[in-house]
Amino acid sequence: ITENQLENLVEQKLKDTYDVKGIERPTYKGDIPEGNNGLGLMLLGLTGDKVLPADVYEEIKERALNSVRGTVQADILKEDQAQNTCIFSTEFSLRLMGDLQSYFIDHKINNFYSVSISGYHIAEAGANPISQLAFTLSNGFTYVEYYLSRGMDINDFAKNLSFFFSNGVDPEYAVIGRVARRIWAKAMKLKYGADERAQKLKYHIQTSGRSLHAQEISFNDIRTTLQALYAIYDNCNSLHTNAYDEAITTPTEESVRRAMAIQLIINHELGLAKNENPTQGSFIIEELTDLVEEAVMLEFDRITERGGVLGAMETGYQRGKIQDESLYYETLKHTGELPLIGVNTFLSDDGSPTVLPKEVIRATEAEKEFQINTLKQLNEVNSHLIEDGLKKLQEAAIANKNLFHELMEVGKYCSLGQITHALFEVGGQYRRNM
């Protein structure tokens, strides 16, 4: 737009779309973040295809899709097993994931992960490190089998898969990444004949929120630091360190800065961290790696005996195991068999009472009203497009066409709620097995 001096055309489109109809233009609230020039705000309330010639827009779109980086989390199996934020039927959700991956392959979207196969939520729900790793990897292999059944090539999609694990303080967490990589690489190479890039498992670590306690909350930074060292020494690809007050409230500016400082101090001040994978070759790390791998393979056998991941889900196997392990941990915590400093042992003179938050960050009434008005504007401006767009989306679902292609279009003028309810009618809502 700037190269071809089309700013006046954009302004005219905004006038026709909003001013003439008496609708307030959407605005960006707040200061522009440092390092951003705000150029993208030029099209706030419009899409590029309303301004640019169709061929130019398509060329720019393809170029953007080829270079854009990011991650879609959308891992439906862990939702059923642990996270509980399922809205569509499992079958329809898998289909949406397959359509997304197929779209990525067709449009050569190589730098965006199509799914973050997540163990973090499984661990936070109560699973021990072995179950977290076994369930997560088995979910990953289930996606692989499903995508292969749809005719996709392993080398086209395996590079778009990433993983997400939790790190606690148990010794198994010290090797969770290297065990995952070992099992994944073996399977990709020996079972699926995948190329070298597909054999490389990329994973993100977030330190364990479940390991943070509402008593003596300043001690939580120590726990997070130790978990961060586990992750870094295990060669994670990326790392998130939790704020110490997340046990009682949404993080504050001060606690977030401290959480970031944990990583910065390790990276810039800790000498050993300058050496990649410093613990490799030690007896305990090698022994742990073999033991954890063996334990994960045994859990794979138990899942296989129950008909694979989907078969095990039908009887609630994963959920039941997670609940049992959660109860076991809580029992050890409350009896004191598992010593937790400042929680059940080494208490302060006043008994280390539960800390109550000084502030709880919530959306203000003004922020809520702003969002409501934004949605109203969206519906008013696009009232002539919404019904036809949603109908076309439903027809694509019934005709077994690629739904992500349609979502890329209908997402320009329909709200998330409108799209969701339209898909409920053709894909079914989630119902948990009892």
State what each model feature region is.
Residues G98, A134-Y143, S162-G342:
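Active-site capping/gating regions of soluble enzymes
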Residues I1-T2, D31-G35, G48, T85-L96, ...:
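Catalytic cores of large soluble enzymes that bind and process phosphate-bearing ligands
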Residues Y103-N110, Y146-I154, K186-A194, Q227, ...:
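Conserved helix-loop functional segments at active or binding sites
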Residues K13-K15, K21, K29, K50, ...:
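Context-gated lysine
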